[in-house]
């Protein structure tokens, strides 16, 4: 249960809304899985530092053996993960997802959800936290197969985006400690000790002057060993355990314990009688993990971690042409607009299924433009006619058209951007677009689904709306055969476009991508012409 699931995670959009604070996988190499989701609260015209954190907890093996302890630790795990990201535990609210076998009239079966609910309630009562809402199902049986007793706890809290803490190691020669609450003989945490630990972590993360904690990991199923390995992978920063490290302790699931990476701080800086502090070791430049005289290369750890599900949720594609031709076009075209405006007007058409018109408008407003978002309505024929007139009017008043991304028309029929294409091929709209380009030196930009529309309309690469031919350029399915959502290192190959006036050929930028059809295909002649 601790192997890599990156191939599955990348199928889901992690950047939509332009509010993500933490990506699902952290570090330069995007290999350290984050234990929580942190995103800014969406705002239309202003920016904010207010964010929310959401984390979950559940151990199916523990819950199958002891539903009470499984649910109790689900709550503890979810809360600890949220605290490790920078949340104040007192601000946390919980919600539960319960799933149990069909109960029937068997008292033992009825005892499982009752036991789990008592365990969750015990943790809530001890921590002073309430659960709001949730969902339950008692139909998890098929013939003689039953689901394990399931109570998944979700912890949700507000926090400052600027104080959010991610999980990957940030630097070398930093000390790494494990902070643990006290446990009784049944491995039950002392909740008073746990609350002291939570308060201490929050105080250390909030202190801007000291900035003690570089990274943090809430220990779970795989113990400290899992934590150290995964924290090392994101930036390929090595780790050396202390000489007195007890290997047997490293694989224990110490729910409620947190591993922290600190800089320039001795253990005395946060020792107390109410929690246990263990120095695990220090980070180092050498990309390996050293323990008891043994060196384990991080590359070997990465291979072992990614191998189990690679055949199911692939992260690498088999390509016939592994080499990629390098294109460069360094000559700039110095074009000045015929008409200048203090605040350019940007028309952003919103279609059914598009989903980033708000953040596109916000980005343009931040850059000094006025955004005009108009919705294409299609419930009745009269609505379509009104939308066509509205779009043509908006284009006549604009200097820029911005096509937003998403899934216009549900990417039907059989392809992306066709709904946008159909609307902009209308004679009124097409005439307005070409007048903007040819007579007013207008600009057009497209992202995701909107870029698909630019290509299908012929605006890229021809600069005019034209009918597609059999050899027209297109965007087609990713070689890996699935949706991709991650940050991609993208090299600037040309500065011919006015949109690239602020960059140079060869510059590399980390660009958020999220698409299933991201592969540009064109004939050699078209490529040469471009």
Describe the residue ranges of each PLM region.
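Amide-donor transfer/coupling interface in amidating biosynthetic enzymes
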Residues: 280, 386, 393, 434-435, ...
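Short phosphate-binding/catalytic loops that engage adenosine nucleotides
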Residues: 87, 275, 369
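N-terminal beta1-alpha1 cap of cysteine-dependent amidohydrolase-like domains
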Residues: 292-447, 451-462, 476-484
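Glycine-rich nucleotide phosphate-binding loop and flanking beta-alpha elements
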Residues: 223, 266, 408-409, 451-453, ...
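Short, surface-exposed beta-edge/turn micro-motifs
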Residues: 173-175, 255-258, 398, 487, ...
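A glycine-rich phosphate/pyrophosphate-binding beta-strand-loop-alpha-helix module
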Residues: 64-132, 136, 140
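Intein/HINT protein-splicing elements and their conserved insertion hotspots or analogous self-processing inserts
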Residues: 1-51, 55-63, 108, 113-114, ...
């Amino acid at each position: 249960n601790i192997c890599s699931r990156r191939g599955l995670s990348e199928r889901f959009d992690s950047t939509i809304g332009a509010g993500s604070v933490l990506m699902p996988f952290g570090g330069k190499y995007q290999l350290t899985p984050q234990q929580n989701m942190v995103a800014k609260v969406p705002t239309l015209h202003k920016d904010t530092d207010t964010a929310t954190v959401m984390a979950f907890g559940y151990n199916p093996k523990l819950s199958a053996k002891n539903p009470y302890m499984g649910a109790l630790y689900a709550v503890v795990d979810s809360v600890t993960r949220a605290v490790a990201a920078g949340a104040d535990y007192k601000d946390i609210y919980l919600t539960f997802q319960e799933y149990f076998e069909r109960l029937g009239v068997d008292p033992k079966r009825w005892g499982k959800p009752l036991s789990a609910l008592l365990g969750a309630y015990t943790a809530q009562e001890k921590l002073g936290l309430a659960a709001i809402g949730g969902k339950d199902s008692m139909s998890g049986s098929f013939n003689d197969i039953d689901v394990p007793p399931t109570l998944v706890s979700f912890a949700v809290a507000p926090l400052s985006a600027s104080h959010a803490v991610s999980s990957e190691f940030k630097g070398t020669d930093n000390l790494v400690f494990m902070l643990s609450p006290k446990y009784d003989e049944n491995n039950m945490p002392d909740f008073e000790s746990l609350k002291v630990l939570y308060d201490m972590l929050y105080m250390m993360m909030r202190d801007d002057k000291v900035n003690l904690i570089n990274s943090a990991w809430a220990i779970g199923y795989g113990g400290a060993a899992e934590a150290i390995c995964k924290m090392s992978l994101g930036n390929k920063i090595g780790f050396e355990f202390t000489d007195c490290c007890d290997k047997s302790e490293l694989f224990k699931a110490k729910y409620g314990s947190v591993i922290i990476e600190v800089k320039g701080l001795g253990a005395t800086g946060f020792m107390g009688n109410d929690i246990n502090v263990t120095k695990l070791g220090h980070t180092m430049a050498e990309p390996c993990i050293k323990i008891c005289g043994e060196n384990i290369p991080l590359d070997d750890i990465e291979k072992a971690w990614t191998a189990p599900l690679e055949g199911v949720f692939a992260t690498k594609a088999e390509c016939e042409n592994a080499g990629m031709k390098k294109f460069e076009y360094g000559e700039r075209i110095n074009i000045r607009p015929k008409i200048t405006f203090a605040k350019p007007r940007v028309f952003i058409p919103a279609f059914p299924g598009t989903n980033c018109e708000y953040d596109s408008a916000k980005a343009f407003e931040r850059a000094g433009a006025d955004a005009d978002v108009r919705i294409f309505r299609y419930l009745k024929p009269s609505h379509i006619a009104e939308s066509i007139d509205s779009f043509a009017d908006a284009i006549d008043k604009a200097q820029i058209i911005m096509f937003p991304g998403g899934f216009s028309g549900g990417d039907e029929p059989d392809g992306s951007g066709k709904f946008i294409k159909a609307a902009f091929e209308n004679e009124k709209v097409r005439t307005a677009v070409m007048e903007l380009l040819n007579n007013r030196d207008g600009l057009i930009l497209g992202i995701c689904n909107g870029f698909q529309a630019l290509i299908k309309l012929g605006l890229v690469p021809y600069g005019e709306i034209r009918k597609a031919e059999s050899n027209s350029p297109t965007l087609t399915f990713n070689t890996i055969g699935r949706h991709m959502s991650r940050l991609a290192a993208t090299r600037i190959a040309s500065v011919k476009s006015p949109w690239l006036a602020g960059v140079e050929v060869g510059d590399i930028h980390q660009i958020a991508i999220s698409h299933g059809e991201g592969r540009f295909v064109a004939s050699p002649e078209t490529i040469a012409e471009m």
